[in-house]
């Protein structure tokens, strides 16, 4: 299947493939079954229809799923990667998913890379600057259901909600779960497959289920 795109100078990016870049300039890209690059006008339609505010040079690969009943604010120079072929074909997930309830709030800084990441907020989830998140990672600020079994399918007012904060320069590996109330300190790394349920110290590596301290990272 082929798709015709209009080349847009504002959406330049480095693919490491000169032929790919030349095809962009010629306005013709060939992909199999999935759109892997969205031009600026199409991107604006997706975000604007969902009430999402965003900065400059936001690049989308594939089509993100957005359900915004609260507030979603994206920074500048971001990449939302949902494609399963083309750029960064290591993506193993179904794509970027951003969802807020009426009370939910998602805010990101600049240079944040979401690679098939799901962010679900009923309270507040804040991401700083220069953050990389691997495929299939889920970030939530709520239990989703009550703990007592009689209330799990009802009494939504009793669900526990706590803000999540991810500070600058954090790298989160693939297939991680970041749970309610978590604070991940500046410059830290979360190993692939980890479940984070508490506070992560700055400039540290945490891994496991639940994630535990592995070692410190030297500050430059």
State the predicted function of each range.
Residues 94, 160, 196:
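Glycine-rich, flexible loop/turn motifs
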Residues 128-161:
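Histidine/lysine/aspartate-rich catalytic loop segments that bind and position anionic ligands
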Residues 155-165, 169, 175:
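Surface-exposed acidic, glycine/proline-enriched linker/cap segments
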Residues 116-127, 174-189, 194-198:
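Beta-rich strand-turn-strand
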């Amino acid at each position: 299947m082929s798709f015709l795109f209009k080349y847009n100078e504002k959406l330049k990016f480095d693919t490491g493939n000169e032929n790919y870049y030349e095809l962009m300039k010629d306005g013709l890209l060939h992909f199999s079954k999935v759109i892997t690059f969205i031009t600026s006008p199409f991107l604006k339609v997706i975000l604007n229809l969902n009430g999402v505010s965003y900065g400059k040079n936001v690049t989308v690969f594939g089509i993100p799923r957005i359900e915004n009943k609260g507030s979603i604010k994206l920074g500048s120079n971001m990449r939302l990667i949902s494609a399963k072929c083309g750029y960064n074909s290591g993506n193993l997930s179904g794509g970027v998913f951003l969802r807020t309830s009426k009370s939910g709030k998602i805010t990101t800084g600049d240079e944040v890379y979401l690679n098939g990441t799901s962010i679900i907020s009923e309270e507040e989830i804040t991401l700083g600057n220069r953050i990389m998140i691997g495929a299939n990672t889920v970030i939530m600020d709520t239990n989703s259901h009550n703990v007592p079994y009689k209330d799990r399918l009802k009494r939504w007012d009793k669900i526990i909600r706590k803000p999540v904060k991810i500070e600058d320069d954090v790298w989160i590996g693939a297939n991680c779960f970041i749970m309610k109330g978590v604070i991940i300190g500046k410059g830290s790394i979360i190993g692939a497959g980890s479940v984070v349920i508490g506070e992560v110290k700055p400039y540290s590596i945490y891994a496991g289920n639940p994630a535990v301290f592995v070692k410190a990272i030297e500050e430059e």
